[in-house]
Amino acid sequence: MNIKTRTKKILQKAMDEPITKEEALYLMGVTGRDLQALMIAADMVREAEAGDRITYIENWNINFTNICSGQCGFCAFKRDAADGDSYYLETERILEIAAEAIEKGARELCIQGGLYPGLDTYFYEDLIRAIKSEFPDVHLHSFSPMEVYYGAQNAELTVEEALKILKRAGLGSMPGTAAEILDDDVRAVICPTKLSTGEWVEVIETAHRVGIPTTCTMMYGHIDGPEHRVEHMDILRRIQEKTGGFTEFVPLPFMHPHAPIYREGLAMPGATGADDLKVYAISRLMFRGLIENIQASWVKLGFKFAQVALLSGANDIGGTLGEENISKSAGASHGVRTEPEEIIRVVRDIGRIPARRDTLYREIEDV
């Protein structure tokens, strides 16, 4: 394959060890055959690290309120309490949705919501206990670092105290959302009222320290550049070296159509397909030996492009989901619910082995 000498040298090295930040930034700029070579190299590392299984989980998202005091410029989900289409689900209704989800096969509930005024750690604790008392076997993968931080502030608790309360109540793991781009200059534009980079890292490292594993995410394609993406992934890499608490990395392409910062002319219209493939491939090469699982979210990418991402370093396709109002509000057009049979079909179509998993990737069963 006719590729640049530097590209070839980096990719050959990547077969044996993680690439550096400088090498990752260089690879963010490759095109043509060099991009194809990057994708192939990442797929080879994926095979060495994670094998030929493509995993998925039967889960259900419950976004319990869209009322939020935050001011995130990428979010089209947020409403004020006075808005006609605002909503807040009472615990009884959440339990009804949980029962329906579990009846349909969900083994994980991912519960997140807006920063409803006054909600605190004790609210989240009571909600966890209510669900676990009714459904003791379901795994609760719930509450973003921002919700944890906000709830702790409102309860006048430290982050560590709050997390210990939630763990005792039955919280199994946390989504590593609210990361967006871990650069405070970028955050000042896209999410000025959200926790800072340092505060996000504090919540995540504390969660890992008290025994709550998390995922990690990166939302890109708005006002960020390649250097922000590489630095973000390097921050995640350093956390994982320290704690080992990340279960997977989930790239989240910016959904621009209804996002305020796009409508105001401040943001790009999302990442390109080449951008997406570079993120999947480079993350695989950066996280070598540290984060085994990289998710290609079909809700964000659609099944067709998710297949390409799965040939470029990713090894997980996400969940069946049930409902996912946040992406839908922002303009995602690929649906919010799928059946396992559809996931199995698209995985087999690329010559891989579909496998059903649990949240923490501890129980994996070929299907």
Curated annotation (Swiss-Prot):
UniProt EC number: 2.5.1.147
Protein's pathway: Cofactor biosynthesis; coenzyme F0 biosynthesis
Pfam families linked to this entry: CofH_C, Radical_SAM
One example GO MF annotation: 4 iron, 4 sulfur cluster binding
Domain named Radical SAM core: residues: 54-288
Cofactor note: Binds 1 [4Fe-4S] cluster. The cluster is coordinated with 3 cysteines and an exchangeable S-adenosyl-L-methionine.
Domain of life: Archaea
Keyword Transmembrane: no
Gene3D superfamilies: Aldolase class I
Keywords linked to the UniProt accession: 4Fe-4S, Iron, Iron-sulfur, Metal-binding, S-adenosyl-L-methionine, Transferase
HAMAP family cross-referenced by the UniProt entry: FO_synth_sub2
Self-association state and partner proteins as the record states: Consists of two subunits, CofG and CofH.
Similarity section: Belongs to the radical SAM superfamily. CofH family.
Function: Catalyzes the radical-mediated synthesis of 5-amino-5-(4-hydroxybenzyl)-6-(D-ribitylimino)-5,6-dihydrouracil from 5-amino-6-(D-ribitylamino)uracil and L-tyrosine.
Matches recorded under PANTHER family: FO SYNTHASE (COFH), LIPOYL SYNTHASE 2
Protein name: 5-amino-6-(D-ribitylamino)uracil--L-tyrosine 4-hydroxyphenyl transferase
Source organism per UniProt: Methanothermobacter thermautotrophicus (strain ATCC 29096 / DSM 1053 / JCM 10044 / NBRC 100330 / Delta H) (Methanobacterium thermoautotrophicum)
Name of the gene this protein is made from: cofH
